[in-house]
């Protein structure tokens, strides 16, 4: 039996631009948090990771919706807002790191 493969429509240019706008900040903040996660309480890390999962799910849903309806500006705004929430959460998590 051949496994089913989901076909995902390509993202419209506006959505790719939103992805690109936040990619660098998210990557840098994720790297800093990953390098220093042992300096935070495990319960804090668990809460941050749970919140990131919720945000990532919202980002995935918005991207799927934009692939299906590329001209929907409301969904594009939701995508950007989700990325903003992710960046803010990562900034706050990094701000919790003890200063050395």
Where are these regions (language model features)?
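Polar, acidic low-complexity tracts enriched in Ser/Thr/Gln/Glu with frequent Gly/Pro and Thr-Pro motifs
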Residues: 1-100
